[in-house]
């Protein structure tokens, strides 16, 4: 059952995406995710990364999308899962995804959906989906 501590964990997790941070990314990870945390975009063997890679990816947003914001639109809890529908927005400081999305100076706004598994009040696993195709269309328009 998801409790109040888990709700606080979820809100603290999303504070990581509202840059700039007041706390270190690694420090927040230590407080809100389990040591064996995984972040996944699918079920394939290369679709997940561990806690250290998550720290690297999120830290990278400080320079790649310095004004990034994540707004929680809806949050649902069931048993040991929390589902979040949110909106990610920002203005890339340069190209994204290895140059796939060139720098245009434009801002994007896309929907994101995350499914978090909670264990002991911390996030053990996240499945996430961001609509990066919509971002690409907005940035290239």
Segments (PLM) and residue ranges:
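C-terminal and inter-domain tail/linker signature
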Residues: 1-141
